[in-house]
Amino acid sequence: MRTFKSLMISLCMGTTLCMCLPQTTTAQTVSSGDSWTWDKGTIVIDTPERPTGQKSVLGLTTPKMEVVRVGFVGLGMRGPGAVERFTYIPGTQIVALCDYEASRAEKCQDILKKASMPKAAIYSGEKGYEELCKRTDIDLVYIAADWLHHFPVAKCALENGKNVAIEVPSAMNLQECWDLINLSEKTRKHCMILENCCYDWFEMNTLNMAQQGVFGEVIRAQGAYIHNLSPFWDHYWKNGKEDKLGWRLDYNMKHRGDVYATHGLGPVAQALDIHRGDRITTLVAMDTKSVVGKDLVEKRTGEECKEFRNGDHTTTLLRTANGKVIEIQHNVMTPQPYNRLYQLTGSKGFANKYPVEGYALDAAQLTASGVQPKVDDLNSHGFLPQAEMEALVEKYQHPILKKYGEMAKEVGGHGGMDFIMDSRLVYCLQNGLPLDMDVYDLAEWCCLAELGAISMDNGCAAVAFPDFTRGEWNVTKGYKHAYASPEDENANMEKAKAFTAKLKEQGAKEWAKEAKKKKK
């Protein structure tokens, strides 16, 4: 038996780091050591047994919440947007705001004022989140902190009996994945990954098509995070004057693997029913050498960069128990258009989002899918003509988009998908339903960096993919979104709207009273 010193995973925050807390030794980014063995050329990592008294959280529900009381941790770049989105969701109350810098938390009070919501309690400092998590009037802790502190904040919240929603990546290594699984199973609280790309329009409509057999059996999928960050490297937070690289470039220099896999993997994993009738069994990763990365370091430091661990382009291949293949790519270095790929290959059809959105079906399959072709000799050698594509999308528009789509475009958040994600989270909590993404999704989507590093550091060897459900991946048949009955949904929404109306009345009075005091 050998022990591998594992690697960590980082978070892309777009252009700047959302610093909530300082980097400390308490925010571990590496597993303490994963035990593994070779088995017929495949690396097999030990799977910890489920502790006595715990049970699976597949399909986990919690009692209905008429009002979802929220505490936000991390108010740098992404956090304030989440606070604002929640002011548009009926039946929510923003109870507390936390950031390492008190000024950032205080600034978010302006968002509440604009929405006529009452002031929230403010927490700050390195351990401010611990006090927030101890409150008894919070149901959900929404974590948009820096990537080092996703896990410690989530751990604290779960240990204090709170449901948690965590920005991506939600866990930095295998140990953190297992710890979050154990905490969710032990506390019976939700632990959701905030993967917004699962709620983009093309992905949702295509998922609906796949679930209804439009593409036949989906046998292969691709996803990616390809985003040239050259304009942004100098905007990442730097730890003092001596730090010439910023956290992100320094991280990429020192660590290998797909460090931001969830945008690409999440949507295709849902389309392939991962841990809902199928599971990933094998991973193999390969990367290019670093050319751009090394050059970036040398230009900023004036010194030779002897090693840049993260390849300019990383490719990870995954095989499932049912013989499907997933390809995930990562590239933040080379000049090329933004691309998440999102491609599904089926036995009877094909879907592709980047760089060109389109569907490929022959006339017989399009007709069988309920859309009559308007052109003769339609085949699958090219994408559907515009009219046929629009008809297909209209027929298979996802019910969630029908419900939230227009409002999402008004509220915004990465084009609206953030608002849809938050709305679904609240909807499921208010109606006592399973969330759209569970803690096993979190683990499966976040572990690619460490597993990929293990593969590449051992000659691009195959790595047996852990079964995070511990044998229950085939219990649930097919990925599904949960819905309340129309009667319950309407009744709960009326209660939510009534609560929010009263809350806004209260908030307006409080802000008016404060304004009078300031005039005096």
From Swiss-Prot:
Substrate binds at Y225, R248, Y260, A261, T262, H263, Y338. InterPro entries: Gfo/Idh/MocA-like_OxRdtase_N (IPR000683), Gfo/Idh/MocA_oxidrdct_glycsds (IPR050463), Glyco_hydro_109_C (IPR049303), NAD(P)-bd_dom_sf (IPR036291). It comes from the Bacteria. Its cofactor is NAD(+). Keywords: Glycosidase, Hydrolase, NAD, Signal. The keyword Metal-binding does not apply. One of its GO terms (molecular function) is nucleotide binding. Residues 1-27 form the signal peptide. Its EC number is 3.2.1.-. Pfam families: GFO_IDH_MocA, Glyco_hydro_109_C. Binds 1 NAD(+) per subunit. The NAD(+) cannot dissociate. It is an enzyme of class 3 (hydrolase). Glycosidase. Belongs to the Gfo/Idh/MocA family. Glycosyl hydrolase 109 subfamily. This is Glycosyl hydrolase family 109 protein 5. It comes from Phocaeicola vulgatus (strain ATCC 8482 / DSM 1447 / JCM 5826 / CCUG 4940 / NBRC 14291 / NCTC 11154) (Bacteroides vulgatus).
